[in-house]
Amino acid sequence: MNGLKMKVVILAGGLGTRLAEETQTKPKPMVEIGGMPILWHIMKIYSTYGVNDFIICCGYKGYVIKEYFSHYSMHMTDITLKINENSISFQKSNLEPWTVALVDTGQNSMTGGRLKRIRSYIKNDEPICFTYGDGVADVNISELIAFHNKHGKKVTLTATHPPGRY
């Protein structure tokens, strides 16, 4: 699929109070589903549609997200170590073609404050997709963007009615 020329901004800074037992040691986007973090699943959805440029707005325990991505290649591919040379080489792999900016947007920042802090990562009038780092949905990104472009609006919102919690 052709890559869509845009960035995805993902909010990943909330406390995750409803998942307190999981979020004592990590932020909610790093809670695993099927052995991979929620954040990874969200990024894979966009990547399936050719969108591979991400800005992650880090907050609560953002260092966990930074550590995950800074070690991502090592955990997802074969490596060769030359111990006496203190070198590591990564073998050919099928790693995702992602560019990931991990931005510390403050632990207590609200949504608007997080967006303000990443302003320098987005060019004027550059289209972006914006999503929360704790929601995985079956959305056809290409169709959503085509719908948005067809209607010529500044913002298109995708929403759903969540099922009851109890």
Question: Residue spans of the language-model regions?
Answer:
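Unchanged
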Residues: 1-166
